[in-house]
C-alpha cells in the first residue's frame, strides 16, 4: 500500500492521477499513478518521530495517543529525515536482532547502502539482542523501542501508515 499525498486531473483527457510515496532511494521520493490503478484505503494512524527529543509519537485521528522514548541513529549513521510509510510489520524470532517485532519503513539509510545483507532499510524494532538505551543516539539509523512499546506498536500499526521523521 502506497500512501497518497496529492491528487490531480489532466484537463485534456480527464484522467485522474494520484501522487504516492515510493519506497527506496532517494528517500521521500514520489510518483504519479492513474487513480483507477489505486485502491482507496484510509488509516487514522500516523507516526511522528522527533530525533532531537528521541521520541516516537503515535497519533490516531490526528490526536496523540502514545509517546515512546527511542534509540535513534548515531551521528555517523543518522536516522534519515522525511516523509515515509510502513512497508511491512514483521514478527521476529526471539533470538533475532531487534526482536520481537520490526516495522520496516520506506526509508533507507543516507549513509549505509547496505546493512547486514539488506538495502540499508530503516525500521522501528525492539532492543532484544541489539541493546541500546532508549533516549540515546546509538543505532545505525533505525529506531529501537523497548519490548512493550514495539509490541504495542506492532499490534496496532499496519502497512501504509504514514511516518514523519524530523529534527
Predicted regions and their residues:
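Beta-strand cores of secreted/periplasmic/IMS beta-sandwich domains, seen most often
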Residues: 2-10, 46, 54-60, 85
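Short, surface-exposed beta-strand-loop junctions and turns on beta-sheet-rich folds
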Residues: 24-27, 62-66, 160
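SH3/SH3-like beta-barrel superfamily modules
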Residues: 1-36
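Short beta-strand segments
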Residues: 29-31, 66-68, 82-84, 120-122
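A structural motif detector for short, solvent-exposed N-terminal "entry" segments of globular domains
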Residues: 35-74
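Beta-strand residues in well-ordered beta-sheet regions across diverse protein folds
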Residues: 19-21, 57-59, 87, 125
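A short, compositionally biased
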Residues: 13-16, 49-54, 98
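Exported/periplasmic cell-wall-interacting domains
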Residues: 24, 37-45, 74-83, 90, ...
